[in-house]
Amino acid sequence: GDETADGIFHPAEFSPLSHFDARRVDFSLARLRHYTGTPVEHFQPFVLFTNYTRYVDEFVRWGCSQILDPDSPYIALSCAGGIWITAETEAPEEAISDLAWKKHQMPAWHLITADGQGITLVNIGVGPSNAKTICDHLAVLRPDVWLMIGHCGGLRESQAIGDYVLAHAYLRDDHVLDAVLPPDIPIPSIAEVQRALYDATKEVSGMPGEEVKQRLRT
């Protein structure tokens, strides 16, 4: 069911109706429910991946504060294990801190807006195979963007601890993608995404452009 998306299906007469066939979509929707512990209807188009619980904790803390803010577009937080948080929920962070999410291989949290333009965070755990699996299944939802957040494992001489490192390369020694994308084909960075993250860093930090360039590395 991935032939169209992988660019290996070349129709002679009829064009496909979508990127994935119906069986592939149904299978992936079921897998998303299983892996993340949340309804597929709650997934938002802006997806973050992480494998560190501290990023989950910060996302939950910030999400709960947004739900309580009357000027915020966010109306609810859907959490792995069937937990649903709104402005009326008492002690929301305590409700989320139970162990329900640990029952799922790649638990998810969805910060939902009324128009469905919110943010989803998925804790993908450790390993490139997990990352590929969740991306394969999320692809049927056609999200606007997905980003991996984590921390850098090494520093150049020009970098210092605390710098924001925007990764734009992938060392393919894990061979996870070899079957669909041979290693001799490079995976380029997306300039539009890099520029958007740079502009967002400048806006949130309040630092002038030259100072941001000293702290943000690619």
Segments predicted by a language model, with ranges:
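Accessory terminal and edge-of-domain segments that mediate assembly/interaction
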Residues: 1-145, 153-218
